[in-house]
Amino acid sequence: MASSASLETMVPPACPRAGASPATSKTLAFSIERIMAKTSEPRAPFEPRPGALEADSGQGKKLLNLCSPLPCMIPLQPLGYEMPSKTLLSYSELWKSSLRAGGSGGGGGGGGGGGGAPVCGASGLCKTNCGVCCKAELGLVPSALPAGRVIKPQVINQAVGLPASGSLYYFNYLDSATYPSSELLGGHLFPSGLLNTQAPAALAAHPKLFLLENAKLAGLTADKFAHPAPYAHKERLPAPLEQVLKENSALTAERGGVKGHSKLPGGSADGKPKNFTCEVCGKVFNAHYNLTRHMPVHTGARPFVCKVCGKGFRQASTLCRHKIIHTQEKPHKCNQCGKAFNRSSTLNTHIRIHAGYKPFVCEFCGKGFHQKGNYKNHKLTHSGEKQYKCTICNKAFHQVYNLTFHMHTHNDKKPFTCATCGKGFCRNFDLKKHVRKLHDSVGPAAPSTKDLTRTVQS
């Protein structure tokens, strides 16, 4: 009691307010009643006081709604294009400009009550301060931004028909289920000239995508951007909007002289197909490299020759596949006869023999073949043309590899030798035929396939 009394004596008595009775005294700031009082609830989100942010639009004073839950996009500086003559205003400058502009900038909106967003009263294209009023209407204030999540910046393309093309935007998506109506999208955010007349109706089906009109605010024009960047967005747009963007892209490319890049097969950057025609047979190729690989068919050149058997090939890759024949590894075996092969493709061709399947039939004699290569070689026998001739004995052949094997008879090069009798052959086929006819009847003395291969390698 003494301590409390001393405290009261140290503090001067409170002065009575005007109009109050002298008996009523003011509660001390450090009184026990104030300290023990119940803590008040947290403060509500910021709401503008009536009259604090009023703008005279000519039709009476109307309040700007700063707490609208609408998503928005914050325009930044253009990326990778020519810098605009008039830079974007800072946040504080935009706010001050909105207060000074009043009704001239479309600040007057209707229906500030509740969570709805007022619609700009400006008719036609919004004026310079439209970006300001859009920010005010969409609730672009520090207290409203934490309610949404900021998505990675994306580049809006000049080819989609936007005057503010090439600008970098931050997409602010609110998790609230409240989205603007189609009237708001069509009447304010998409004025004439921003997109074509079909855009507002198409974009109404995708309420999360909003484009702020900052062309006049930044001083940007569509003719300043000559190189369009691809339209990027995390979410797939609805089909009507994609159709609208495609149409606008085609129109902008026509007007701006931007050449489209064709991604069709056989197409080039200028849209013209790449046709490389063979002058001999008229076959068409989509690349010059393929035409170069085709020409040895007519010239007969086989620069890639096997060092073991002397067989020539047009391509190095074919020679590499051929070299497997001379190795001992044959992992692919036939389940019916037990014959082993180096490649699985050769095994598949061999299985046709057991099945009796001969898909390649000669049109002249009706003979069938398991492989397409044998079918082509057989057709040359009906033509009677033997363009490959030996320079020593003038013997002619249908195929160039037959001439290559024939040349071994003149230089005594016979890489395939029989392990039983020691006879040499130019081709492995002739060696196998020799063993089958002469040595298979002997039985134990008949060499195996592995022995023949080892003889060739030695």
Curated annotation (Swiss-Prot):
Gene: FEZF2
Location of region: Disordered: 1-22
Entry's family note: Belongs to the krueppel C2H2-type zinc-finger protein family.
Extent of motif Engrailed homology 1 repressor: 26-41
Location relative to the cell: Nucleus
Name of this chain's protein: Fez family zinc finger protein 2
Coiled-coil zones: none
Pfam families in the cross-refs: zf-C2H2, zf-C2H2_6
GO MF term list: DNA-binding transcription factor activity, RNA polymerase II-specific; RNA polymerase II cis-regulatory region sequence-specific DNA binding; zinc ion binding
Keywords linked to the UniProt accession: Developmental protein, Differentiation, DNA-binding, Metal-binding, Neurogenesis, Nucleus, Repeat, Repressor, Transcription, Transcription regulation, Zinc, Zinc-finger
Tissue distribution of the protein: Highly expressed in brain and weakly in the mammary gland. Infection enhances expression in the mammary gland and promotes expression of SEMA5A.
GO terms for biological process, alphabetical: cell differentiation; nervous system development; regulation of DNA-templated transcription
Function according to Swiss-Prot or TrEMBL: Transcription repressor. Binds to 5'GCAG-3' core sequence. Required for the specification of corticospinal motor neurons and other subcerebral projection neurons. May play a role in layer and neuronal subtype-specific patterning of subcortical projections and axonal fasciculation. Controls the development of dendritic arborization and spines of large layer V pyramidal neurons. May be responsible for mastitis resistance and innate immunity.
Gene3D superfamilies listed in its UniProt record: Classic Zinc Finger
